[in-house]
Regions:
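Bacterial N-terminal signal peptides
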Residues: 16-28
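Short, polar loop/linker segments at the starts of domains and inter-domain junctions
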Residues: 50-65, 243-252
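N-terminal secretory signal peptides that target proteins for export/translocation
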Residues: 1-12
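Mature N-terminal segment immediately following signal peptide/propeptide cleavage
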Residues: 40-47
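Disulfide-stabilized, aromatic/cysteine-rich ligand-recognition loop
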Residues: 34-39, 120-121, 125-127, 139, ...
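Active-site microenvironments of metalloenzymes and redox enzymes
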Residues: 62-166, 270-274
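Cytochrome P450 core scaffold surrounding the K-helix E-X-X-R motif
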Residues: 50-54, 209-217
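Short, well-ordered junction/capping motifs at the entry into regular secondary structure
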Residues: 172-199
Length: 277
């Protein structure tokens, strides 16, 4: 319980790095492991009128250049990861780092449900597991700002959010009933940067998910201490017409780092210099 509390109340990434990799390296497991090279594309620097703004300012956010995985991490990718790093297998991972639903859709701890699953996005993964995976391939989870910046682009524009037709299409994706099985990653068309599946496939973890809190006047949360702890991280919501993004904020801000769901996956980012063709 003491460990879980400390993880909740410090920067989640900072706590995870010390706890998770200390345990992994102590067991002789390092971040390097063999796998097919994932595809990353460069996302150039720019500015973003984020739906999240600090109380003190409503200026656009400057976003440094970075590289992003073109698609979410697949079940096949994650299977190779847990085979190389058994700490993250569902029958080995401590409950502090993953809840009882972790990888529950797999056949066993080391086998996917069916042959087609390898190309589907991995879900039922905790924030801790997602962050550990990204670090294992030399990356990390994107910040909310990085994810929002990349997701604002369509095929030809850096920011398509003012286009009602674009917003309607995205909302249409989210309104579809859930299917029995998720489709393979990469099924959607790439955006301006070459990134796919930012909308319409799965929700995605971000590094700073636990800072995505609206201010006390605009939410009826039952944990006022959480708002006090976040302090300057408490935010106001702008652009309330962008319901698809607001739904993501509502989901992510309700989660703990050990939670996993059937609709939540992730992708990784790297420094821009590590982008791959």
């Amino acid at each position: 319980m003491a460990v879980a509390t400390s993880v909740t109340r410090c920067g989640a990434r900072r706590c995870a790095a010390a706890l998770l990799w200390g345990a992994a390296l102590g067991a002789g497991l390092g971040p390097a492991w063999a796998q097919p090279a994932p595809a990353y594309v460069a996302v150039p620097a720019g500015t973003l009128a984020s739906v999240l703004t600090n109380d003190a300012t409503q200026e656009d956010v400057k976003v440094p250049a970075f590289a992003m995985r073109t698609t979410p991490v697949t079940q096949g990718d994650f299977l190779r990861f847990v085979q190389a790093q058994p700490l993250w297998q569902r029958d080995q991972v401590p409950r502090t780092f993953a809840d009882a639903g972790y990888l529950q859709d797999w056949d066993t701890a080391n086998r996917l449900a069916d042959a087609d699953a390898a190309q589907r996005p991995v879900t039922h993964v905790s924030w801790f597991a997602a962050q550990a995976y990204c670090e294992s391939e030399g990356g990390r989870l994107p910040t909310w700002t990085e994810w929002e910046y990349a997701a604002a682009a369509d095929a030809t524009r850096r920011d398509a959010r003012s286009d009602p037709a674009w917003l309607a299409r995205i909302l249409g994706w989210y309104a579809r009933p859930a299917s029995a099985a998720l489709p393979a990653v990469g099924s959607s068309s790439p955006n301006l940067y070459g990134v796919r599946d930012l909308h319409g496939l799965v929700w995605e973890w971000v590094d700073d998910f636990n800072a995505l809190l609206v201010n006390a006047d605009s939410r009826s949360g039952d944990d006022p201490d959480k708002l006090k702890f976040c302090g300057a991280g408490a935010i106001n919501l702008q652009d309330k017409q962008n319901y698809a993004v607001l739904m993501r904020i509502a989901l992510l801000s309700s989660l703990n780092a050990s939670d996993s769901t059937s609709s939540l996956g992730f992708r990784c980012v790297r420094p821009n210099l590590k982008a791959t063709p």
